[in-house]
Amino acid sequence: MIHFICALKCEASPLIEHYQLKHIQKAVLFNIYMNNENGVSLTITGVGKLAAAMATTYTYTFLQCEADDVWINMGVAGHATHNIGDIYIANRIEDVSNTSTWY
């Protein structure tokens, strides 16, 4: 299964529409959308690292995910010199709050 994690509804809406995801009413802590036929879920987390971590953990437990499921954290960001509409895939992520780096 593929699980998308998005902070905001405006980031999630195109994916919800494209994958024809339906809101799971029983998921009360976070908004989770799912389509069992195509094996896709999406969780709206709210902004911030802690919210993303809690929502991802909640989704993993609530949906009883498998170890080989795919997780994609997707969102939008702004930048002073990059053009609107440019797409980037992060291959290095730095957390300046604790100097961690992930590849």
Q: Where are the language model's segments positioned?
A:
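Metabolite-binding pocket within alpha/beta catalytic cores that recognizes anionic/polar moieties
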Residues: 1-103
